[in-house]
């Protein structure tokens, strides 16, 4: 095999796309900062037990593992940043009130999340700790929508769900972890026949409720149908009320509901959302509430957040126009160097053409050039 061939679903990012990704990263972090979110940078490599805390088998399977040559302990390359940020909130910051944190960095997956997905996403996310009320859920959802608006994602649509509905239906039913994961997969796939087989020994009320979830997706009428089809358990009633309130606060956004949506990692404990947009084969953003994610670090407090892949975001945005640049000759003349430095100080891109070469760039369009005229260097159109 040729030395330049990369592993499957791993790719180099070339100049024009790399610049686009960097500009999106800056815009997303600046938007989060406007909401009061502080930037943190957790390490790419960490002890395995810290990375996989409370996250379930899905994250375990997605994590690359290796042995630390210094300590002999198992380590992992992060597949998701949320457990790390929870550790920072619980153990390092340990603040008494609300904490707002954001991050942006690479994660690594053993398998791609979708047929054409990268195994090295650039994950951006924001998380709010310390408030159990719906105000935090709404803030994180509005921040996610504003992030997409800032980078000019057209007409995003929000899909709402709540993990507590399924948890309430399964409460009191002896379900092993493997069976629970099969049930979650059948619900996500809307596979009623498989779900019927998996739940055939369940109590009738739980079984009928789970089977009803397969059909409970669509517009706001779904919530009314759910009130009739599901048991009037307190957790279910509260979840449906919360979803209705959240939807009512999203003025102008297209909102739908999918009460069987359990995709993502196992740490979600309450309301959850996915945001879709034209041109994307999967959700651009996933988020929700995960109140127990920091428990293993000694601080079990409310938390909500979201994440997205900046690389995937680039794929649904129109191609950027090339940046206008100025072409300049390479000479030892001091006045030329002064002219070039002055233009760069003004924010202009000046590309020096080295002797014997033409300038070849993917990211810039040289529409002007620096030429000598009457003893001065001036910018002229090409």
From Swiss-Prot:
Q: Where in the cell is it found?
A: Cytoplasm
Question: What UniProt keywords apply to this chain's record, in alphabetical order?
Answer: Amino-acid biosynthesis, Cytoplasm, Histidine biosynthesis
Task: Give GO terms for biological process.
Answer: histidyl-tRNA aminoacylation; L-histidine biosynthetic process
Q: Tell me the route in metabolism or biology where this protein functions.
A: Amino-acid biosynthesis; L-histidine biosynthesis; L-histidine from 5-phospho-alpha-D-ribose 1-diphosphate: step 1/9
Cite the record's note on assembly: Heteromultimer composed of HisG and HisZ subunits.
What family, per the record? Belongs to the class-II aminoacyl-tRNA synthetase family. HisZ subfamily.
Q: Which gene encodes it?
A: hisZ
Q: Kindly give the HAMAP family that the UniProt entry links to this protein.
A: HisZ
For this entry, the protein name equals ATP phosphoribosyltransferase regulatory subunit
Which Gene Ontology cellular component annotation is one that this UniProt entry carries?
A: cytoplasm
Q: What is the role of the protein in this entry?
A: Required for the first step of histidine biosynthesis. May allow the feedback regulation of ATP phosphoribosyltransferase activity by histidine.
- GO MF: histidine-tRNA ligase activity
Does the keyword field hold Lyase?
Answer: no
Which PANTHER family does the protein's record reference? HISTIDINE--TRNA LIGASE, MITOCHONDRIAL-RELATED, HISTIDYL-TRNA SYNTHETASE
Q: Chief localization class? A: cytoplasm
């Amino acid at each position: 095999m040729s030395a330049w061939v990369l592993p499957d679903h791993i790719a180099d990012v070339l100049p024009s796309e790399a610049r686009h990704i960097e500009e999106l990263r800056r815009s997303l972090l600046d938007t989060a900062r406007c909401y009061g979110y502080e930037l943190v940078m957790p390490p790419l490599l960490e002890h395995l037990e810290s990375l996989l805390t409370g996250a379930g088998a899905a994250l375990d399977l997605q994590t690359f593992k290796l042995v630390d040559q210094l300590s002999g302990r198992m380590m992992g390359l992060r597949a998701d940043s949320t457990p790390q940020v929870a550790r920072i909130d619980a153990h390092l910051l340990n603040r008494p009130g609300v904490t707002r944190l954001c991050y942006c960095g690479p994660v690594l997956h053993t398998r791609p999340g979708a047929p054409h997905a990268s195994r090295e996403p650039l994950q951006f996310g924001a998380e709010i700790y310390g408030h159990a009320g719906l105000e935090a859920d709404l803030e994180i959802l509005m921040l996610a929508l504003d992030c997409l608006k800032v980078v000019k994602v057209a007409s995003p649509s929000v899909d709402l769900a709540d993990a507590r509905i399924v948890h309430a239906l399964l409460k009191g039913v002896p379900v092993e972890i493997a069976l629970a994961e099969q049930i979650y997969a059948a619900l996500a796939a809307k596979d009623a026949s498989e779900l019927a087989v998996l739940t055939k020994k369940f109590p009738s009320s739980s079984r009928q409720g789970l089977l009803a979830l397969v059909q409970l997706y669509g517009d706001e009428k779904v919530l009314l149908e759910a009130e009739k089809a599901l048991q009037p358990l307190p957790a279910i009633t509260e979840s449906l009320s919360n979803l209705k309130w959240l939807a009512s606060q999203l003025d102008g956004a297209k909102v739908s509901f999918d009460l069987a949506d359990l995709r993502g990692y196992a740490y979600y404990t309450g309301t959850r959302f996915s945001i879709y947009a034209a041109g994307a084969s999967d959700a651009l953003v996933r988020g929700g509430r995960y109140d127990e994610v920091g428990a293993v670090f000694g601080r079990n407090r409310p938390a909500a957040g979201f994440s997205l892949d900046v690389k995937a975001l680039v794929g649904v945005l129109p191609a950027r126009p090339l940046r206008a640049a100025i072409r300049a000759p390479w000479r030892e003349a001091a006045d030329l160097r002064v002219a070039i430095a002055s233009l760069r100080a003004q924010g202009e891109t000046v590309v020096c053409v080295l002797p014997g070469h033409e300038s070849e760039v993917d990211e810039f369009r040289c529409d002007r050039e620096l030429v000598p005229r009457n003893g001065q260097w001036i910018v002229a159109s090409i």
